[in-house]
Amino acid sequence: MSKRKLTQNQQRRIQSNNAKTLHRHQHRHKSDIDWQDDMLGDFQDGTVVTRYAVHADVENEQGEIVRCNLRRTLKSVVVGDRVVWRKGKEQLQGVRGVIEAVQPRHNQIVRPDYYDGLKSIAANIDRIIIVSAVLPNLSLNIIDRYLVVCESSNIPAVIVVNKADLLSSEARTEVSLQLEIYQKIGYETLLISAKSGENMDKLTALLSEGTSIFVGQSGVGKSSLINYILPEVNAQTGKLSQVSGLGQHTTTSSRLYHLSQGGNLIDSPGIREFGLWHLDREQITNGYREFQYFLGTCKFRDCKHLHDPGCAIQLAVKEGKIDPLRFENYHRLITSLSETKSQRHFISAN
């Protein structure tokens, strides 16, 4: 009797589990330091400024950064977390402290992971900077995906379009018209160029208050923006793949930077596909802020806002109160949700 052929999902799951087992084995000696009370100093507050696979860098109130282990009881520790930690009396295997607890988060950004459920990216954010680029083309669908995440996380968003120096006058006009779609519904937008410096002063001023995070696909120029804003950091920049047009991942760990003019900036690894599997139809619908005024006024309570009679959203589109491109992207998201929704239960990222 021949063996049943594994599906692609089953093969990926086996490969992922195997990789995780190898990773745990390879790093077991690094992460399993048994810190005893007599090896540690007093409890103190700190902020996670870098998160690695098995360690985290914590900054104390005096600005000192210490590499720490994590207590095994901690479910999730991400950049931006306020933590309670203790400094070791000596350095062990390159580690000088241990994180004991994570303070309650004001907010967090999460994304679904097929194998690990909901995965936190960063915590305690004041604004999300959605970075897009004009090449290969400006994707409003991707921008809308990020905006749904921002709205569901209740975190203000700013749309930044990089590489404006590559635009012809005609293309610049087209991009400006696309950005007006978002300006009309209350989103702040910036058309910038890290290469020419266009509008970089406005971006720098925006970042000077609170903690911001750059999100966006690889290759949109997040590292180039950081090099401009923080030249001393010299973040590694990558070249676009000439074959696919997709960028190479150049940031391997999430990091928090302090800006000289004030404010903090978090840079996270680029993500080519920002899944929304953990959100249901109602959450995605609520992620479109211009829909809010019309929701609840459709003829039928279970209106899907597609071909339903008496749909207030469709009427608003026809009357020019909702942009048709946004409405089209909304249904693309709903369709993709129906096609790719995993049956697994997404556990909390806390």
Curated annotation (Swiss-Prot):
<keyword id="KW-0963">Cytoplasm</keyword>
<dbReference type="InterPro" id="IPR030378">
    <property type="entry name" value="G_CP_dom"/>
</dbReference>
<keyword id="KW-0699">rRNA-binding</keyword>
<dbReference type="InterPro" id="IPR027417">
    <property type="entry name" value="P-loop_NTPase"/>
</dbReference>
<comment type="function">
    <text>One of several proteins that assist in the late maturation steps of the functional core of the 30S ribosomal subunit. Helps release RbfA from mature subunits. May play a role in the assembly of ribosomal proteins into the subunit. Circularly permuted GTPase that catalyzes slow GTP hydrolysis, GTPase activity is stimulated by the 30S ribosomal subunit.</text>
</comment>
<keyword id="KW-0547">Nucleotide-binding</keyword>
<keyword id="KW-0694">RNA-binding</keyword>
<feature type="binding site">
    <location>
        <begin position="216"/>
        <end position="224"/>
    </location>
    <ligand>
        <name>GTP</name>
    </ligand>
</feature>
<feature type="binding site">
    <location>
        <position position="298"/>
    </location>
    <ligand>
        <name>Zn(2+)</name>
    </ligand>
</feature>
<dbReference type="GO" id="GO:0005525">
    <property type="term" value="F:GTP binding"/>
</dbReference>
<dbReference type="GO" id="GO:0046872">
    <property type="term" value="F:metal ion binding"/>
</dbReference>
<feature type="compositionally biased region" description="Polar residues">
    <location>
        <begin position="7"/>
        <end position="20"/>
    </location>
</feature>
<feature type="domain" description="CP-type G">
    <location>
        <begin position="106"/>
        <end position="274"/>
    </location>
</feature>
<feature type="binding site">
    <location>
        <position position="303"/>
    </location>
    <ligand>
        <name>Zn(2+)</name>
    </ligand>
</feature>
<feature type="binding site">
    <location>
        <position position="305"/>
    </location>
    <ligand>
        <name>Zn(2+)</name>
    </ligand>
</feature>
<dbReference type="GO" id="GO:0019843">
    <property type="term" value="F:rRNA binding"/>
</dbReference>
<keyword id="KW-0690">Ribosome biogenesis</keyword>
<dbReference type="InterPro" id="IPR010914">
    <property type="entry name" value="RsgA_GTPase_dom"/>
</dbReference>
<dbReference type="GO" id="GO:0005737">
    <property type="term" value="C:cytoplasm"/>
</dbReference>
<comment type="subunit">
    <text>Monomer. Associates with 30S ribosomal subunit, binds 16S rRNA.</text>
</comment>
<dbReference type="Pfam" id="PF03193">
    <property type="entry name" value="RsgA_GTPase"/>
</dbReference>
<keyword id="KW-0342">GTP-binding</keyword>
<dbReference type="InterPro" id="IPR004881">
    <property type="entry name" value="Ribosome_biogen_GTPase_RsgA"/>
</dbReference>
<dbReference type="GO" id="GO:0003924">
    <property type="term" value="F:GTPase activity"/>
</dbReference>
<feature type="binding site">
    <location>
        <begin position="162"/>
        <end position="165"/>
    </location>
    <ligand>
        <name>GTP</name>
    </ligand>
</feature>
<dbReference type="InterPro" id="IPR012340">
    <property type="entry name" value="NA-bd_OB-fold"/>
</dbReference>
<feature type="region of interest" description="Disordered">
    <location>
        <begin position="1"/>
        <end position="30"/>
    </location>
</feature>
<keyword id="KW-0378">Hydrolase</keyword>
<protein>
    <recommendedName>
        <fullName>Small ribosomal subunit biogenesis GTPase RsgA</fullName>
        <ecNumber>3.6.1.-</ecNumber>
    </recommendedName>
</protein>
<keyword id="KW-0479">Metal-binding</keyword>
<dbReference type="GO" id="GO:0042274">
    <property type="term" value="P:ribosomal small subunit biogenesis"/>
</dbReference>
<feature type="binding site">
    <location>
        <position position="311"/>
    </location>
    <ligand>
        <name>Zn(2+)</name>
    </ligand>
</feature>
<keyword id="KW-0862">Zinc</keyword>
<comment type="similarity">
    <text>Belongs to the TRAFAC class YlqF/YawG GTPase family. RsgA subfamily.</text>
</comment>
<feature type="compositionally biased region" description="Basic residues">
    <location>
        <begin position="21"/>
        <end position="30"/>
    </location>
</feature>
